[in-house]
Amino acid sequence: MSCCGGNCGCGSGCQCGNGCGGCKMFPDFGSDEKITTTHTLVLGFAPAKGSVEGFEMVAGAAENDCKCGSNCSCTDCRCDPCNC
């Protein structure tokens, strides 16, 4: 689910990162949960995209950004369905 084009995962962990997938994009891991890491090897190439398309995507993301504020709260959040 993607409701927010900015850089904030609005959860109790207040984790900020790139490519917001919506509120609580980053899971809140408890002390008894195990975190695993996987590696992916990509074999092959895709045709290059036009630079105009990439620019539009970046410009669109800048319009709807959420920022992590004090006390793990969201400020300047304009992702309507998300209500961070």
UniProtKB/Swiss-Prot annotation:
GO molecular function ontology, one term from the record: metal ion binding
One Pfam family named in its UniProt record: Metallothio_2
Keywords recorded for this protein, A-Z: Cytoplasm, Metal-binding, Metal-thiolate cluster, Nucleus
Induction note: Up-regulated by cadmium treatment.
Major localization listed first in the record, in broad terms: cytoplasm
Tissues expressing the protein: Expressed in leaves, stems and roots.
Gene Ontology cellular-component annotations: cytoplasm; nucleus
UniProt subcellular location: Cytoplasm; Nucleus
Statement: the UniProt record of this protein carries the keyword Ribosomal protein: no
UniProt keyword Lyase, yes or no: no
InterPro entries: Metalthion_15p
Protein family: Belongs to the metallothionein superfamily. Type 15 family.
Notes on the domains: The N-terminal (1-23) and C-terminal (66-84) Cys-rich domains are both involved in zinc binding.
Described purpose of this protein according to its UniProt entry: Metallothioneins have a high content of cysteine residues that bind various heavy metals. Probably involved in maintaining homeostasis of essential transition metals and detoxification of toxic metals. Increases cadmium and zinc tolerance when expressed in heterologous systems. Metal chelator binding 6 cadmium or 5 zinc atoms per protein.
Protein name (record): Metallothionein type 2b
Organism whose genome encodes this protein: Colocasia esculenta
